[in-house]
């Protein structure tokens, strides 16, 4: 089977069936989905009834089962990102969710409401920016992984050969993946970030590409998914690959990021920064070893760069991570702790050079992947930098962009694009492209995990910290606080539904969506607002004597402040918590 998927498709809809027609040159296949039996079959174009309503689509994301029955999810708009070794890369920008059922009359009012909520969850994930695909190229693998494949692998369909860590519609495609004959209709979709630029230095033109692949294992939102699971999958795991294509030569440099790989949590509780909790009873070494065993198999040597604070609430996590590495005693793993905030305080961001100098020799040892124009592998990357902070976002992005630039400097010199002694940061035009692309990558990763753009991107874009950047960081921090406390439960549920961590059972009489709120949820905020309002009224409408006014103000002031602290104490009752999948509670 050719390792391509159909690019041009038409969707024909009748009351009984969906017909997905392949319109590529020479194609005669039609995928038929029975809207009643849900059976999937393959036919030819002459089987499409002329009475069907027809529209163009650009790919099938898959199918999902909700309360009302099955739904077909299709890509309705796409945008060209660029060309990758003569393969077109697309970004999916709009989707449609089509019900198999013609009416909802078979549902009760409660089922209708639940179905509406599940649809909103599905659409929430689909509206998240960052879904990419190609009908001819396997985006889920790095250049180095693709170079080490067998002829049998290259004959597989894109879906079969894809790295399942990065196929975000894997659950939606489960029915199609069970039938190899329809795999050309099944499109593996990546979630993350891709940017491509044609660049020029010294009159030499090359393509520069940046790809971030988000893992769909232990996926979720900032405060609800931390650490690792029992299988060793780390939260917010992202593989970032930087690629250069010059005169037939291809070079790539891969880095990873992922949450501190022990069992810990940091549940929102209305505090600006909840204290992280390390599980006191879990077997940390078991999960830790599983995580790094798989990382070493996939990537080789691991150089861990831990950027968390060495004091305060982050200190126990740094100590635990260091202890785990020491206890494991693997020659394949090296550990570097760099207190980012301490080293760079008072906007001394030039001090990041201390870390770069510290790891320079290790980076040269890890090298990068390079294949020449004849297809011969010149060098392999022997391992990766695995960077992390608390969120694996802001501090991590800064460090990754600096490490990637150092690798790129070496690659471009080796390829003859840069002259001996020339520095990449002196190439103003390219530097602007480079910094903006890495800042855009930072924003994409941050929005997908934390719900807002990244912090510290002014440094990534300009090379220095600015006052405007500090103001924007403040705004994004406040926005994160709101989302993390009051909307992330819904976001987490949406991701769990999309990835199949939760399956809808319409026969289940107890809906997880209808969780009754405790009396405190409504009563305490109302009491606080009333008390605060009365305090203001007493200030504006003075009593007969100043002592009387003071007494009223003190009474209502103490009532409002007291209620505020009671709300804060019971913070976990007021946040928007996930309802579908109960993660391990680590308190």
Curated annotation (Swiss-Prot):
It is a multi-pass membrane protein. One of its GO terms (cellular component) is endoplasmic reticulum membrane. GO terms for molecular function: phosphatase activity; phosphatidylinositol-3,5-bisphosphate phosphatase activity; phosphatidylinositol-3-phosphate phosphatase activity; phosphatidylinositol-4-phosphate phosphatase activity. It catalyses: a 1,2-diacyl-sn-glycero-3-phospho-(1D-myo-inositol-3-phosphate) + H2O = a 1,2-diacyl-sn-glycero-3-phospho-(1D-myo-inositol) + phosphate; a 1,2-diacyl-sn-glycero-3-phospho-(1D-myo-inositol 4-phosphate) + H2O = a 1,2-diacyl-sn-glycero-3-phospho-(1D-myo-inositol) + phosphate. Residues 542-548 are lumenal. Its main location: endoplasmic reticulum. The keyword Transmembrane helix applies. Changing residue 391 to N: Reduces phosphatase activity towards PtdIns(4)P, but not towards PtdIns(3)P or PtdIns(3,5)P2. Residues 122-451 form the SAC domain. The keyword Endoplasmic reticulum applies. It comes from the Eukaryota. Keywords: Acetylation, Endoplasmic reticulum, Golgi apparatus, Hydrolase, Lipid metabolism, Membrane, Transmembrane, Transmembrane helix. Its EC number is 3.1.3.64. Residues 1-520, 570-587 are cytoplasmic. It is found in: Endoplasmic reticulum membrane; Golgi apparatus membrane. Phosphoinositide phosphatase which catalyzes the hydrolysis of phosphatidylinositol 4-phosphate (PtdIns(4)P), phosphatidylinositol 3-phosphate (PtdIns(3)P) and has low activity towards phosphatidylinositol-3,5-bisphosphate (PtdIns(3,5)P2). Shows a very robust PtdIns(4)P phosphatase activity when it binds PtdIns(4)P in a 'cis' configuration in the cellular environment, with much less activity seen when it binds PtdIns(4)P in 'trans' configuration. PtdIns(4)P phosphatase activity (when it binds PtdIns(4)P in 'trans' configuration) is enhanced in the presence of PLEKHA3. This is Phosphatidylinositol-3-phosphatase SAC1. It comes from Rattus norvegicus (Rat). The lineage of its organism: Eukaryota, Metazoa, Chordata, Craniata, Vertebrata.
């Amino acid at each position: 089977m050719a390792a391509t998927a159909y690019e041009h498709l038409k969707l024909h809809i009748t009351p009984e069936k969906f017909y997905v027609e392949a319109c590529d040159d020479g194609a005669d296949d039609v995928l038929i989905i029975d809207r009643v039996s849900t059976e999937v079959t393959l036919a030819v174009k002459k089987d499409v009834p002329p009475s069907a309503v027809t529209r163009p689509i650009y790919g099938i994301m898959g199918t999902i089962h909700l309360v009302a029955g099955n739904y077909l999810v299709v890509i309705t708009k796409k945008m060209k990102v660029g060309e990758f070794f003569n393969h077109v890369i697309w970004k999916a920008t709009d989707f449609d969710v089509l019900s198999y059922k013609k009416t909802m009359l078979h549902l009760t009012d409660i089922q209708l409401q639940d179905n509406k909520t599940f649809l909103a969850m599905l659409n929430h994930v689909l509206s998240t920016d960052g879904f990419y695909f190609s009908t001819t190229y396997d985006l889920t693998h790095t250049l180095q992984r693709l170079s080490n494949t067998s002829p049998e692998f290259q004959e597989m369909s894109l879906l079969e050969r894809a790295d399942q860590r990065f196929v975000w519609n894997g659950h939606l495609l489960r029915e199609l993946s069970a039938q190899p004959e329809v795999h050309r209709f099944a499109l593996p979709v990546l979630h993350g970030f891709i940017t491509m630029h044609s660049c020029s230095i010294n009159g030499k033109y090359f393509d520069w590409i940046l790809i971030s692949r988000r893992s769909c294992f232990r996926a979720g939102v900032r405060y609800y998914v931390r650490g690792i699971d029992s299988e060793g999958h780390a939260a917010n795991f992202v593989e970032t690959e930087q690629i250069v294509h010059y005169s037939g030569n291809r070079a790539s440099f891969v880095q990873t990021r992922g949450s501190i790989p022990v069992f810990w949590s940091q549940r929102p509780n209305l505090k600006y920064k909840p204290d992280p909790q390390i599980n006191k009873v879990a077997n940390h070494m078991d999960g830790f070893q599983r995580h790094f065993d798989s990382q070493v198999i996939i990537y080789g040597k691991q150089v861990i760069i831990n950027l968390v604070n060495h004091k305060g609430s982050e200190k126990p996590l740094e100590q635990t991570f260091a202890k785990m590495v020491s206890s494991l005693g693997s020659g394949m793993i090296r550990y570097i702790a760099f207190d980012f905030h301490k080293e760079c305080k008072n906007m001394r961001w030039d001090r990041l050079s201390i870390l770069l100098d510290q790891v320079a020799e290790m980076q040269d040892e890890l090298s990068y992947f390079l294949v020449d124009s004849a297809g011969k592998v010149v060098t392999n990357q022997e391992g990766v930098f695995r960077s992390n902070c608390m969120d694996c976002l802001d501090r991590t992005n800064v460090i990754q962009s600096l490490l990637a630039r150092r690798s790129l400097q070496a690659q471009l010199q080796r390829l003859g694009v840069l002259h001996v002694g020339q520095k990449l940061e002196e190439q103003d035009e390219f530097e602007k492209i480079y910094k903006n692309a890495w800042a855009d990558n930072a924003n994409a990763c941050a929005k997908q995990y934390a719900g807002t753009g990244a912090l510290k991107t002014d440094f990534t874009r300009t090379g220095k910290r600015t006052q405007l950047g500090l103001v924007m960081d403040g705004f994004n921090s406040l926005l994160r606080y709101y989302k993390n406390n009051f909307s992330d439960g819904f976001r987490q549920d949406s991701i769990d539904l999309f990835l199949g961590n939760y399956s809808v059972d319409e026969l289940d009489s107890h809906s997880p969506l209808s969780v009754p709120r405790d009396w405190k949820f409504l009563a305490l905020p109302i009491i606080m607002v009333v008390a605060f309002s009365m305090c203001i009224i007493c200030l504006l409408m003075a009593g007969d004597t100043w002592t009387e006014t003071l007494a009223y103000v003190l009474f209502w002031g103490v009532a409002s402040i007291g209620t505020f602290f009671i709300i804060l104490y019971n913070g976990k009752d007021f946040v928007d918590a996930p309802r579908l999948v109960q993660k391990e509670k680590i308190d």
